Amino acid sequence: MALSKAEILDAIAGMSVLELSELIKEMEEKFGVSAAAAAVAVAAPAAGGAGAAAAEEQTEFTVVLLEAGANKVSVIKAVRELTGLGLKEAKDLVDGAPKPVKEALPKADAEAAKKKLEEAGAKVEVK
């Protein structure tokens, strides 16, 4: 017997964050997709509207990878941890620097992401 959409949503609502993370990884592997790529694509238009509000006080920040530095493998690992991207997507992002890693973040989260990437050896900017 197939589960209804409501039953699936109820099951997901009862999961912990760790269980949800594992479920997403399994779904990405099974269906050959990346949930993070869709989230970045959805967040990009929202960040465009933030330019008008920047004249006031900036509340959303973008972490931009300027350069991978000498330890590219560590930077790729850090990008994967921060974004949830797959290995190929994270490598492409690092190879294509300068590129935004995360967008529309609160200042504290942006600074934490910057610190993590810098510890891995990358040159990073918060805009």
Swiss-Prot record:
Q: What CDD domains does this protein map onto?
A: Ribosomal_L7_L12
Keyword Manganese in annotation: no
Give the function comment from the record.
Forms part of the ribosomal stalk which helps the ribosome interact with GTP-bound translation factors. Is thus essential for accurate translation.
Q: Which InterPro entries match?
A: Ribosomal_bL12, Ribosomal_bL12_C, Ribosomal_bL12_C/ClpS-like, Ribosomal_bL12_oligo, Ribosomal_bL12_oligo_N_sf
Check the record and name the Pfam families matching this protein. Ribosomal_L12, Ribosomal_L12_N
Q: What UniProt keywords are attached to this protein's entry? A: Ribonucleoprotein, Ribosomal protein
Q: Can you say what this protein is called?
A: Large ribosomal subunit protein bL12
Q: Show the GO cellular component annotation of the record.
A: cytosolic large ribosomal subunit
Gene3D superfamilies xrefs: 3.30.1390.10, Single helix bin
> Could you cite one Gene Ontology molecular function of this protein?
mRNA binding
Which GO BP annotation is one of this protein's? Answer: translation
Subunit info? Homodimer. Part of the ribosomal stalk of the 50S ribosomal subunit. Forms a multimeric L10(L12)X complex, where L10 forms an elongated spine to which 2 to 4 L12 dimers bind in a sequential fashion. Binds GTP-bound translation factors.
What NCBIfam families does UniProt report for this protein, alphabetically? L12
| Origin species | Bordetella pertussis (strain Tohama I / ATCC BAA-589 / NCTC 13251)
Q: Which domain of life is it from?
A: Bacteria
Tell me which family the UniProt entry assigns to this protein: Belongs to the bacterial ribosomal protein bL12 family.
Tell me if Cell inner membrane is a UniProt keyword of this record.
Answer: no
